[in-house]
Amino acid sequence: MAYATILMIFSVVALMSGERAHAAVDCSSLILNMADCLSFVTSGSTVVKPEGTCCSGLKTVVRTGPECLCEAFKNSGSLGLTLDLSKAASLPSVCKVAAPPSARCGLSVSGDPPATAPGLSPTAGAGAPALSSGANAATPVSSPRSSDASLLSVSFAFVIFMALISSFY
């Protein structure tokens, strides 16, 4: 049951990343190759090495559409999924996959948030809004919202995906 939940969350992330990725690569299906990586990169996970087909899935994503990897990491917070950025950044070296800089998403293995990826901070929840430096610390700055059309297409894809998953149970 827990595996099905993790797979569902990862699939929704993949569907959302497909909305924003280049049209030449189908990120939604490509990221599903990395479903076994989620147990390793989820914040608070005690898994010490990637499981199952994680590394072969990572290799497929890096070879086919490395930008999809970054999109999945960036969109994970919108689903309430918090990632351990140190583990996420270490995936290529742990899996012995040569990843181009675009597949590293600006993440550093030390866990320090890079200047190029402010939405991926290990100190705040991945979905937490950023705080303005001049504002009261209790007042969050509104994040830009996606258009209603994009939200509708993700919702429709989610309904289709859930129907598919429920047919197996």
Swiss-Prot record:
UniProt signal peptide: 1-23
- Tissue note: Expressed in a vascular-specific manner, mainly in roots, and, to a lower extent, in hypocotyls, seedlings stems and flowers.
Residue positions of covalent lipid attachment, annotated as GPI-anchor amidated serine: S146
What GO CC terms are in its UniProt record?
extracellular region; plasma membrane; side of membrane
Disulphide bond pairs: C27-C70, C37-C54, C55-C95, C68-C105
Which molecular function terms from Gene Ontology are attached?
lipid binding
* Propeptide positions: 147-169
Record note on disruption phenotype = No obvious defects in morphology. Plants lacking both XYP1 and XYP2 have morphological defects in vascular development; e.g. discontinuous and thicker veins with the improper interconnection of tracheary elements (TEs).
Give me any GO biological process, just one.
Answer: xylem development
Q: Which SMART domains match?
A: AAI (SM00499)
For this UniProt record, the keywords arranged alphabetically read as follows: Cell membrane, Disulfide bond, Glycoprotein, GPI-anchor, Lipoprotein, Membrane, Secreted, Signal
Concerning Pfam families, the annotation shows: LTP_2 (PF14368)
This molecule's function is given as: Probable lipid transfer protein. Proteoglycan-like factor that exhibits xylogen activity consisting in mediating local and inductive cell-cell interactions required for xylem differentiation.
Tell me its family.
Belongs to the plant LTP family.
Protein's recorded name:
Non-specific lipid transfer protein GPI-anchored 11
Q: What is the lineage of its organism?
A: Eukaryota, Viridiplantae, Streptophyta, Embryophyta, Tracheophyta
